[in-house]
Amino acid sequence: MTEVVHLHMPEEARATQSRDATPRERRYYVWTVGCQMNVSDSERLEAALQGVGYAPAERPEDASFIVLNSCSVRASAEERILGKLSEVQRLKRKHPDTKVVLWGCMVGPGNQSIFQSRLPMVDHFVSPSAVDEVLALAPNPIYQLEEPALPVARWDHPPVSVHVPIQYGCNMSCSFCVIPLRRGRERSRPLDEIVEECRRIVARGAKEITLLGQIVDSWGHDLPGRPDLADLLRAVHDIPGLLRLRFLTSHPAWMTDRLIAAVAELPRCMPDINLPVQAGDDALLKIMRRGYTVQRYRDLIAKIRDAIPDVSLTTDVIVGHPGETRERFEGTKRLLEDIRFDKVHIAAFSSRPGTRAADMELDPTLAVPEGEKQLRRIELERLQEQIAAERNARFLHQTVEVLVEGEHKGKWRGRTPGNKLVFFSDPDDWTGRLARVIITHTGPWSLQGVLARSDETFARVNGALHAVAAANGAAV
């Protein structure tokens, strides 16, 4: 999953903070590094903190309660957290009463004793996703929560799209991944609990829900009756007011015919599937302990595209894993050329302590030099940029439906059913609404267009585009 730094503070909170008289002792600051699961955990914590009377602080020095939600997927993520902790250490010299919590995947089994000696500025260490445990550490609460906090609970303007965790942990044993060591074994949330939470979120104004799990398509196998993700999609799909439904991240081993059929049949379930492949060589997939072959993956992609012709497919790839020869890397390159994904998250291998791949990295006959890792990463990124540009070009002059998430640099920003990012201009407020947009420009990362307010507008703009194309000797 992509490593991102997130500062969790709603825009309206920033705008009104200077007018807010909340004292420092009831202000919090949450800083998050990592995947969307971490982001969701932090959003829930913020909603809970606001529910007991806290207000967000824009800067750590303005808060008495600081929470750093950490990631261990790559070394760079841990380095960011350690850098932030150095900043916090200086702050605590000035404000020794500040309470600091290190939360998330850095705080796994066996790690707390190590970090307690290395990180004296941290008052408490809390395992991933334990929102209630972090909340209990907050000093000076005014209220008590009457029900579990939602990620939109205290926001005047809830986000258009909300991520809902449906499962925690992971039972896989991929050679490179530290997540099972940090988040533990899979635990699925009950179907009724998830549906009720989604219902409450939509009632607060959210329009799109993304169901979230480390291996989201394995949801339910540990629950009574063994429901599956297809069952859950059908249950959430029928919530009144919900416009769109997505899920991530999937594993090829759990992508069943029932799940593919559900995505194909449910109109509000978006044709958007993330299916990490990690490598395009059978020997390397075996080393990685992925549990499938290249041909099985290719067959699965063909099955998905046959059932969902307009599907948008994204994947994850690791380059430089121990044992990746140049020949094996070329297999991954061929796979990307053949399948032509809409988007690929490409990462250079990062050795994580405790994983099988970390031991392999110590073998000089298996390790890939760091410089070579980066060269391979750049090579695939350039290839994928070209593929993405070509795939997005098919939207030129087409009218697409865009769920508008908000404003960005003077333009409205939203996404198509296939999760393509679209920008357009209009004086009206389109936040949370579905817009018909005629695409006038495409690129590898986003699309731009004009609003088609009516059939007359569509005909006028489309006619102009045809005229331009004809003048250039091209077909629309």
UniProtKB/Swiss-Prot annotation:
Descriptive protein name: tRNA-2-methylthio-N(6)-dimethylallyladenosine synthase
Domain TRAM: 393-453
Function: Catalyzes the methylthiolation of N6-(dimethylallyl)adenosine (i(6)A), leading to the formation of 2-methylthio-N6-(dimethylallyl)adenosine (ms(2)i(6)A) at position 37 in tRNAs that read codons beginning with uridine.
Cellular localization per UniProt: Cytoplasm
EC number(s) from the headed UniProt entry: 2.8.4.3
Pfam families (alphabetical): Radical_SAM (PF04055), TRAM (PF01938), UPF0004 (PF00919)
Domain annotation MTTase N-terminal: ranges: 26-147
Positions annotated to bind [4Fe-4S] cluster 2: C170, C174, C177
Ranges where the record places region Disordered: 1-20
GO molecular-function terms, A-Z: 4 iron, 4 sulfur cluster binding; metal ion binding; N6-isopentenyladenosine methylthiotransferase activity
Binding site for [4Fe-4S] cluster 1: C35, C71, C105
Catalytic reaction annotation: N(6)-dimethylallyladenosine(37) in tRNA + (sulfur carrier)-SH + AH2 + 2 S-adenosyl-L-methionine = 2-methylsulfanyl-N(6)-dimethylallyladenosine(37) in tRNA + (sulfur carrier)-H + 5'-deoxyadenosine + L-methionine + A + S-adenosyl-L-homocysteine + 2 H(+)
EC top class named in words: transferase
Entry keywords, A to Z: 4Fe-4S, Cytoplasm, Iron, Iron-sulfur, Metal-binding, S-adenosyl-L-methionine, Transferase, tRNA processing
